[in-house]
């Protein structure tokens, strides 16, 4: 009986993943939603708001943060809607999260972190998180073909919400990419690959977190990858870059959408990057 339930649940998870994909959810979101739903099934719960609350209470007791519980709620609400149980989905309310941004690093702190990188790969990872404002998942998914060496920009594919965007990069940052690629001895299509594995798989988010933590610790700082992205936005704003341009650079607008906040062209984005000179400052150029 249990084996039959596992087969049924496996089929449901597969169908739910397809549904999420058609809804335009990113691969990372699909992975997280199906993971939480599988845990929901494993505990033997039924698709009702009452059972969902029991599940959430158990997760909270086990140490889940309010922010993590919000993600679980979104996953369950999506599943209930997938099953046509909209009334049950409506009963689930997201707890309010205090709005807070991670503490921004100073330019001097970023410079110190970059300066202690052990190798060109790690240095470039830090520079892209900061100098291009990338999310960890976006960094890991970057392929070499996403770097336009002639026109000096990155194509970030499948960002949050499955959105793509173009990020102009400075000549200095492009040079760092070229310098790093000359050291690569593998045929992986990805810009960054794992070092310790026999197969050169693409870089994992866990590795990014670990190396950022490692280099932060070397200079006496507790740093996260998102702090580098947040520092990118903060330092751009401090240097007079329009907040609407920063929002687009961060990926808060779809590549095909040109008028969400205001009309912003690639030319203006490039001027913003060149005006800020973030990488040049960090590298002392």
Curated annotation (Swiss-Prot):
Belongs to the 'phage' integrase family. XerA subfamily. Residues 7-84 form the Core-binding (CB) domain. GO terms for molecular function: DNA binding; tyrosine-based site-specific recombinase activity. It is found in: Cytoplasm. The lineage of its organism: Archaea, Methanobacteriati, Methanobacteriota, Thermococci, Thermococcales. It comes from the Archaea. Coiled coil: none annotated. One of its GO terms (cellular component) is cytoplasm. PROSITE patterns: CB, TYR_RECOMBINASE. Its main location: cytoplasm. Site-specific tyrosine recombinase, which acts by catalyzing the cutting and rejoining of the recombining DNA molecules. Keywords: Cytoplasm, DNA integration, DNA recombination, DNA-binding. Residues 100-274 form the Tyr recombinase domain. InterPro entries: CB, DNA_brk_join_enz, Integrase-like_cat_sf, Integrase_catalytic, Integrase_recombinase_N, Integrase_SAM-like_N, Tyrosine_recombinase_XerCD, XerA. Gene3D superfamilies: 1.10.150.130, Intergrase catalytic core. The active site is at residues 135, 160, 226, 229, 252, 261. This is Tyrosine recombinase XerA.
């Amino acid at each position: 009986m249990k084996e039959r339930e596992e087969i049924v649940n496996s089929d449901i998870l597969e169908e739910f993943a397809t549904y999420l994909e058609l809804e335009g959810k990113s691969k990372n979101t699909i992975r997280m939603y199906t993971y939480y739903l599988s845990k929901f099934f494993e505990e033997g719960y039924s698709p009702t708001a009452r059972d969902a609350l029991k599940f959430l209470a158990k997760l909270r007791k086990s140490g889940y943060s309010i922010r993590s519980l919000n993600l679980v709620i979104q996953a369950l609400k999506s599943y209930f809607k997938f099953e046509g149980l909209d009334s049950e989905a409506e009963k689930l309310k997201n707890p309010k999260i205090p709005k807070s941004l991670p503490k921004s690093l100073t330019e001097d702190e970023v410079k110190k972190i970059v300066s202690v990188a052990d190798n060109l790969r790690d240095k470039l990872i830090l520079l892209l998180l900061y100098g291009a404002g990338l999310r960890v998942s976006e960094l890991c998914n970057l392929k070499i073909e996403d770097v336009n060496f002639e026109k000096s920009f990155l194509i970030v594919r499948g960002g949050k919400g499955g959105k793509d965007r173009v990020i102009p990069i400075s000549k200095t940052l492009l040079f760092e990419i070229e310098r790093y690629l000359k050291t690569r001895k593998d045929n992986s299509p990805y810009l960054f690959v794992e070092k310790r594995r026999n197969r050169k798989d693409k870089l994992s988010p866990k590795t990014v977190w670990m190396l950022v933590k490692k280099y932060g610790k070397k200079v006496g700082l507790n740093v996260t990858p998102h702090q580098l992205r947040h520092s990118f936005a903060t330092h751009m704003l401090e240097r007079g870059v329009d907040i609407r341009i920063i929002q687009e650079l961060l990926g808060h607008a779809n590549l095909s959408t040109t008028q969400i906040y205001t009309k912003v062209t690639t030319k203006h984005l490039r001027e913003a990057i060149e005006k800020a000179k973030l990488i040049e400052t960090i590298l002392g150029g």
